[in-house]
Curated annotation (Swiss-Prot):
One Pfam family from the record: Ribosomal_L20
Molecular-function GO terms, alphabetical: rRNA binding; structural constituent of ribosome
Any one annotated GO CC term: cytosolic large ribosomal subunit
Record's keyword terms, sorted: Ribonucleoprotein, Ribosomal protein, RNA-binding, rRNA-binding
Listed name of the protein: Large ribosomal subunit protein bL20
Lineage of producing organism: Bacteria, Bacillati, Cyanobacteriota, Cyanophyceae, Synechococcales
Annotated InterPro entries: Ribosomal_bL20, RIBOSOMAL_L20_CS, Ribosomal_protein_bL20_C
Domain of life: Bacteria
Family recorded in the similarity comment: Belongs to the bacterial ribosomal protein bL20 family.
GO BP, sorted A to Z: ribosomal large subunit assembly; translation
Organism: Synechocystis sp. (strain ATCC 27184 / PCC 6803 / Kazusa)
Coiled coil location: none
Keyword RNA-binding annotated: yes
Amino acid sequence: MTRVKRGNVARKRRKKILKLAKGFRGSHSKLFRTANQQVMKALRNAYRDRRKRKRDFRRLWITRINAAARQEGMSYSKLTGQLKKANIEINRKMLAQLAVLDPAAFSEVVKVAATAK
């Protein structure tokens, strides 16, 4: 059996990590060991925060809808309940956009929801 020299494989692996670490400060972008640790940490944080972003935006939308609904004299929870009764299927993102960009349309939606039985 012939001997396999791993120089090329190791170099490629290290270059890949150092390429991912480009832009990091100090030794985190120069030395393989610290760069590897930082890349692993960065990828772990990115994975976690892709999921967290969805939660954060949902919280933001709910806060905006609640603020706009209270200006119309209704709480967020009452508004969502009334929207379900009125069979209005507007998601939270769209409601928040309406509340911010078109308050008149949002108040119409609230009025329609308030009259629902």
